[in-house]
Amino acid sequence: MKKTALSAWHEGAGAKMIDFGGFLMPVQYSGIIAEHKAVREAAGLFDVSHMGNFYVRGERALEFLQYVTTNDLGKIVDGQAQYTLMLYPDGGIVDDLIIYRVSADTFFLIVNASNCEKDFAWLSDHVGGFEGVTLENRTSELSLIALQGPKAFEVLGRVFPEAGLDKLASFHFATVPFGGAEAMVARTGYTGEAGVEICLPNEEAEALWTALMAAGKNDGIQPIGLGARDTLRLEMGYSLYGHEIDQTVNPLEARLKWVVKMDKPNFIGKQACQQVELDPRKSVVGFSLDGRAIPRQHFKVYNSDKQEIGEVCSGTVSPTLQEPIGTASLLRDYAKTGTPIFVEIRGTFQPGTVRRLPFVHADRP
């Protein structure tokens, strides 16, 4: 099993470690609810170094990425990032990812840990038609640290006092020196709160981590495991590969039409999306349950006549709302906010209601 450059720190801090995407990762430290609360109210630090990262370079790099992704990369400039998807020809999702434009011929991609090898192979399979474009997998060399929460920029400013990082716009990034290397600091995240994700060489990761923890000590900063990362993203309704999205799901049936630019020239999966656009049958929605039972992935969802209308994608008890919440893929006729539903849990039908996403309106400036 692979380890990140911060594994020894996590173990020293008493984290409960699990296998996630082939990496030994912290699932929790003090506890999911306390960690979740720290991010919503103060600041939290996440090791997300298991995520895959690639460089795409060459004069035709933009043309290549436009072909293999759904969003319009032509709309962003140097120092800007974009959320996007890679699709199979049938419209199923290869992965969701963020692309960072370093320059006109250099792009940096961050992909899901569980899809890293698959994604690199997919890109490699399609790059041949774009002469001069090179792919470079840097996953094993780089660490990724996320600092999230309403006090994130106060903490960041103590470690990088001259960088003016609080002025970064959403989905923009800057490169700043740290130790003997450069760190890429991007105003992105997976929590809904203000914050950044910082990419830097493994050799400098622990020094940055400990500096941020020390800088946030009086603000209540906490290290955050994958457990709270999941409850935070679910409160925001953000997709997780293998749950809301996968190779069987078309983005137009998963609340992701906004990243599929049909007016862009041909891209892989475009024709399939055009077909679904004519008659989308399903939609991913948020819901809450009336009782205390917790909905889990693949649990069946029914209408008031007890007819099956879909299944749960993700579920948890919201630490903020203190009630069971989830996402579900439902037939579109039942996707309207306020629609009554029933989730089958251990042989019982638990009543609930379709809810508007996000569940929580985080204080993101």
Curated annotation (Swiss-Prot):
One of its GO terms (molecular function) is transaminase activity. One of its GO terms (cellular component) is cytosol. It catalyses: N(6)-[(R)-S(8)-aminomethyldihydrolipoyl]-L-lysyl-[protein] + (6S)-5,6,7,8-tetrahydrofolate = N(6)-[(R)-dihydrolipoyl]-L-lysyl-[protein] + (6R)-5,10-methylene-5,6,7,8-tetrahydrofolate + NH4(+). Keywords: Aminotransferase, Transferase. Its EC number is 2.1.2.10. The keyword Transferase applies. It comes from the Bacteria. InterPro entries: GCS_T, GCS_T_bac, GCST_C, GCV_T_N, GcvT/YgfZ/DmdA, GcvT/YgfZ_C, TrmE/GcvT_dom1. The keyword Transferase applies. It is an enzyme of class 2 (transferase). GO terms for biological process: glycine decarboxylation via glycine cleavage system. Gene3D superfamilies: Aminomethyltransferase beta-barrel domains (3.30.70.1400), Aminomethyltransferase fragment (4.10.1250.10), Probable tRNA modification gtpase trme, domain 1 (3.30.1360.120). It holds the Pfam family GCV_T. The glycine cleavage system catalyzes the degradation of glycine. Belongs to the GcvT family. This is Aminomethyltransferase.
